[in-house]
């Protein structure tokens, strides 16, 4: 089996693709993969690190407002399509899979022009422009949230969940080694992170909250994002139980040892939380398309699996209050979170791949 797969920009588009690749490798030891991304996206780091063949193209996302930048984007899109036609003629993929981000646009579009079967995976409750555009000719559109089908009229949609959740469940974890790696004692771990790029608002609130967090019987593992690490390290007061890191590469292992998560409400994060049955405090990013992170979070909040703190209300004080409340309700929230998960999402997406090839 040969697959070409594309998704990039943030971990939310990349991790589901990598999880699918691992599942297909187990089923098809002779699997050949070509991953297409951009050289400046996070995929240029994560994909080769996972041992997956990677090739970059130059492309940019469309601006939603009128902009001369869109002329340049159209040029790069057409140039990428010409190059991808040659790549696909040489590689001969059985199927092309797009997991979102603007880089997947020319890849899936080219496959559709060549008559190669295509599958889209939409991680968010509200789709981005790329997947909405491509869905009209896609053979299958795999969804992560109930109710998202209304955004894909006429498409062949399947509700499967997010493969990232399956990946974290399958990770074998030695908790003692994880705690030793991050220098954590046996107190419950509260993980704070703002997604693959970090989040300034969360960083500010945590720095403000550190004196109060130091008094709680917990370990706080605080992941700033690489861009923010130096600034946060200088601002943060010292604390024996607050441990600051720029990035975590093996998030599944860390999550498996965690008692409470404080994070944005990106799609991969939601899938990880529900797969593992983790309670959470969600701070949706107000800067994303159509406020989709708030809608991602709503399913958890409405079912008692998470607490919601709007970014404009996030301070050190409100953060500590939410942590205290979540720790008191941890068992109930964990059970509610687990009930919302799709533990077999990666297998379900692999089934779709095999289905369209047959």
From Swiss-Prot:
Q: Which family does it belong to?
A: Belongs to the glycosyltransferase 28 family. MurG subfamily.
Which CDD domains does the UniProt record give? GT28_MurG
Record's protein name: UDP-N-acetylglucosamine--N-acetylmuramyl-(pentapeptide) pyrophosphoryl-undecaprenol N-acetylglucosamine transferase
What exactly does this protein do?
Cell wall formation. Catalyzes the transfer of a GlcNAc subunit on undecaprenyl-pyrophosphoryl-MurNAc-pentapeptide (lipid intermediate I) to form undecaprenyl-pyrophosphoryl-MurNAc-(pentapeptide)GlcNAc (lipid intermediate II).
Q: Which Gene3D superfamilies match?
A: Glycogen Phosphorylase B
- Alphabetic keyword roster: Cell cycle, Cell division, Cell membrane, Cell shape, Cell wall biogenesis/degradation, Glycosyltransferase, Membrane, Peptidoglycan synthesis, Transferase
Does this entry carry the keyword Secreted?
Answer: no
Catalysis: reaction(s): di-trans,octa-cis-undecaprenyl diphospho-N-acetyl-alpha-D-muramoyl-L-alanyl-D-glutamyl-meso-2,6-diaminopimeloyl-D-alanyl-D-alanine + UDP-N-acetyl-alpha-D-glucosamine = di-trans,octa-cis-undecaprenyl diphospho-[N-acetyl-alpha-D-glucosaminyl-(1->4)]-N-acetyl-alpha-D-muramoyl-L-alanyl-D-glutamyl-meso-2,6-diaminopimeloyl-D-alanyl-D-alanine + UDP + H(+)
Tell whether Methyltransferase is among the UniProt keywords. Answer: no
Any one GO molecular-function label of the UniProt entry: UDP-N-acetyl-D-glucosamine:N-acetylmuramoyl-L-alanyl-D-glutamyl-meso-2,6-diaminopimelyl-D-alanyl-D-alanine-diphosphoundecaprenol 4-beta-N-acetylglucosaminlytransferase activity
Q: Which principal EC class is assigned to this enzyme?
A: transferase
| Its EC number(s) | 2.4.1.227
Pfam families in the cross-refs: Glyco_tran_28_C (PF04101), Glyco_transf_28 (PF03033)
Q: Which pathway, metabolic or otherwise, does it act in? A: Cell wall biogenesis; peptidoglycan biosynthesis
Which InterPro entries does the entry link to? GlcNAc_MurG (IPR006009), Glyco_trans_28_C (IPR007235), GlycoTrans_28_N (IPR004276)
Binding, UDP-N-acetyl-alpha-D-glucosamine: 10-12, 124, 196, 293
Q: Name one GO cellular component term.
A: plasma membrane
- What is the topology of this protein in the membrane according to its UniProt annotation? Peripheral membrane protein
* Source organism (scientific name): Exiguobacterium sp. (strain ATCC BAA-1283 / AT1b)
In which compartments does the protein localize? Cell membrane
GO BP terms in the entry: carbohydrate metabolic process; cell division; cell wall organization; lipid glycosylation; peptidoglycan biosynthetic process; regulation of cell shape
